[in-house]
């Protein structure tokens, strides 16, 4: 079994042991995702009142929005053990069986990237999730026999950026599906301000606002930018980080006012300059940018589409009006007509 499987005490996670994690540790400390957070609090309280394992939870949405953090918080709030692994490292049914049989009653098992589980391993997971039982084949050929193993009741918390890739039988076994969405600038400003306190930084309100505004609606990016701005402040001997210093540091990092980095701008320019604004297939874009298709779909595109900079159509990707404006370019007449026709299609009943 892979060494990437981890057992942890929910009150002391590996991320807490360094310089000071920026992760919140309780639902009360968790900023954003209001509806999902409030519903999860109710489900956790109900499970504790019944002294039962919480129903299985599926967390899906773009990367960096707090899926792993929420999984850890669920274990803390329930007061149970937390076990973590990921889909790609579970190579055999025996690996999964070893993990499941070592769980204590009501423990939380976190599987990241669950969409990358092999189909044969998914089949083993079905009875484990539904009946807390494992059906394993022991031996080979005529001597093979089926063995059923009873498991302690547990909660599977799974995370994925590609919920559509999950097999329907697997997806349907999650009683609590929660979609995480991009954070508002106000939520990110609160996250950045709290992170600055944990890092011992003196950060002005407008400095926090500047970092939040360029964080693409994503706490993970906000935390990364906050740490890099701190580095610039330290080396330049600034005791206080204000908007001007944050702006200068983020400019050095090539993060523009909308939070787009050099790769995002390459993506937009590729569509504009090489494909006349699109539509263009994602495979063609991936080849032209020398990036994996998954990188475009999971990392680059979600925020660009959310902001209207890019449109995803049946014929491929197109630059939206906001994308042309961001590049400081004027769309050709053919693109203006095409964008107008798409708007009319969207407004049709």
UniProtKB/Swiss-Prot annotation:
Entry EC number(s): 3.6.4.-
Binding site for ATP: 22-23, 64, 67-69, 130-132, 173, 183, 220
Location in the cell: Cytoplasm
Stretch list, region Disordered: 1-25
Entry GO MF terms: ATP binding; ATP hydrolysis activity; four-way junction DNA binding; four-way junction helicase activity
GO cellular component: cytoplasm; Holliday junction resolvase complex
Stretches the record annotates as Head domain (RuvB-H): 257-349
A GO BP annotation: DNA recombination
Reaction(s) catalysed by this chain's protein: ATP + H2O = ADP + phosphate + H(+)
Keywords: ATP-binding, Cytoplasm, DNA damage, DNA recombination, DNA repair, DNA-binding, Hydrolase, Nucleotide-binding
Domain of life, source organism: Bacteria
Record-stated family: Belongs to the RuvB family.
Subunit structure: Homohexamer. Forms an RuvA(8)-RuvB(12)-Holliday junction (HJ) complex. HJ DNA is sandwiched between 2 RuvA tetramers; dsDNA enters through RuvA and exits via RuvB. An RuvB hexamer assembles on each DNA strand where it exits the tetramer. Each RuvB hexamer is contacted by two RuvA subunits (via domain III) on 2 adjacent RuvB subunits; this complex drives branch migration. In the full resolvosome a probable DNA-RuvA(4)-RuvB(12)-RuvC(2) complex forms which resolves the HJ.
PANTHER family: HOLLIDAY JUNCTION BRANCH MIGRATION COMPLEX SUBUNIT RUVB (PTHR42848:SF1), PTHR42848
Domain comment quoted from the record: Has 3 domains, the large (RuvB-L) and small ATPase (RuvB-S) domains and the C-terminal head (RuvB-H) domain. The head domain binds DNA, while the ATPase domains jointly bind ATP, ADP or are empty depending on the state of the subunit in the translocation cycle. During a single DNA translocation step the structure of each domain remains the same, but their relative positions change.
UniProt-recorded name of the protein: Holliday junction branch migration complex subunit RuvB
Gene designation per UniProt: ruvB
